[in-house]
């Protein structure tokens, strides 16, 4: 009988120990589940931060590409303005040459007109001399008539030359007026281009400032990219470590669940044995 009582006491103590161990295992299992949930939350947070970091990196690269495109467009516009200024400078030089040639033609026409006027005056004087010497001999008259005819011919030629010179002078004046009009238009265009050049110069200075600022932003972007890249790598490493930790915790949870199941089975076996013992005692 004493042996049975001792056995019952031992079995009771073993049952209590099994209950304590089961409670400890359940508490440890709950703590493990909480740690697992916290790690999973950290892992999800790291994934969100990783996605945000990648988005920030894409936005930074897009902004950098936009700044570079604007700078290239500005450089192209400056080159086009410089080519237009060079073209207008060549046109102005050609107009100045045309004006010089027109002035030379005008001077030549004026000289020819002066010669024609002198010839006409000389013919008029000869005619008057012939009238005053009307009483000379026939040979003298014939000679004078010949001189008069020659003088008339010279006068007619002079008139023709005068008319031709006047016509050429009129044409020259028209050409000169056109050249002056083109020159005025060219000067106006030059003034306009100078104003545009001033604006372009101001724009260039502004663009240089913007370019300097863009360079500073680019340096800042590069630093940000490096920082984001490092943060991304760190997040990836932490995510990898979290995955490993989650895997370990899952294995630990499985082990604890198996151990808890074993303890429950042992507890059931002890309970069954106690029930059998009580039944045996009741039989006495």
Swiss-Prot record:
<feature type="compositionally biased region" description="Polar residues">
    <location>
        <begin position="44"/>
        <end position="60"/>
    </location>
</feature>
<feature type="compositionally biased region" description="Basic and acidic residues">
    <location>
        <begin position="32"/>
        <end position="41"/>
    </location>
</feature>
<feature type="region of interest" description="Disordered">
    <location>
        <begin position="32"/>
        <end position="60"/>
    </location>
</feature>
<keyword id="KW-0175">Coiled coil</keyword>
<keyword id="KW-0677">Repeat</keyword>
<dbReference type="InterPro" id="IPR000533">
    <property type="entry name" value="Tropomyosin"/>
</dbReference>
<feature type="coiled-coil region">
    <location>
        <begin position="1"/>
        <end position="284"/>
    </location>
</feature>
<comment type="similarity">
    <text>Belongs to the tropomyosin family.</text>
</comment>
<protein>
    <recommendedName>
        <fullName>Tropomyosin</fullName>
    </recommendedName>
</protein>
<dbReference type="Pfam" id="PF00261">
    <property type="entry name" value="Tropomyosin"/>
</dbReference>
<comment type="subunit">
    <text>Homodimer.</text>
</comment>
<comment type="function">
    <text>Tropomyosin, in association with the troponin complex, plays a central role in the calcium dependent regulation of muscle contraction.</text>
</comment>
């Amino acid at each position: 009988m004493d042996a049975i009582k001792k056995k019952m006491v031992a079995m009771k103590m073993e049952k209590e120990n099994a209950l304590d161990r089961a409670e400890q295992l359940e508490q440890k299992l709950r703590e493990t589940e909480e740690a697992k949930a916290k790690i999973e939350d950290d892992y999800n947070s790291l994934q969100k931060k990783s996605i945000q970091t990648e988005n920030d990196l894409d936005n930074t690269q897009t902004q950098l590409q936009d700044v570079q495109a604007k700078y290239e467009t500005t450089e192209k516009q400056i080159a086009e303005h410089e080519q237009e200024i060079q073209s207008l400078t060549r046109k102005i030089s050609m107009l100045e040459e045309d004006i010089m040639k027109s002035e030379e033609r005008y001077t030549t026409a004026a000289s020819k007109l002066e010669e024609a006027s002198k010839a006409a005056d000389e013919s008029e004087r000869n005619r008057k001399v012939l009238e005053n010497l009307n009483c000379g001999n026939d040979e003298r008259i014939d000679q004078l008539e010949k001189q008069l005819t020659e003088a008339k011919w010279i006068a007619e030629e002079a008139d023709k030359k005068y008319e031709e010179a006047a016509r050429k002078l009129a044409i020259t004046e028209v050409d000169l007026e056109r050249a002056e009009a083109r020159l005025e238009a060219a000067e106006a265009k030059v003034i306009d281009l100078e104003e545009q050049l001033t604006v372009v110069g101001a724009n260039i200075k502004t663009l240089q400032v913007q370019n300097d600022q863009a360079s500073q932003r680019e340096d800042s972007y590069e630093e940000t990219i490096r920082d984001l890249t490092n943060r991304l790598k760190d997040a990836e490493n932490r995510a990898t470590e979290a995955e490993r930790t989650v895997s370990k915790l899952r294995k630990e949870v499985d082990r604890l669940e198996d151990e808890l199941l074993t303890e429950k089975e042992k507890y059931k076996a002890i309970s069954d044995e106690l029930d059998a013992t009580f039944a045996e005692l009741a039989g006495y």
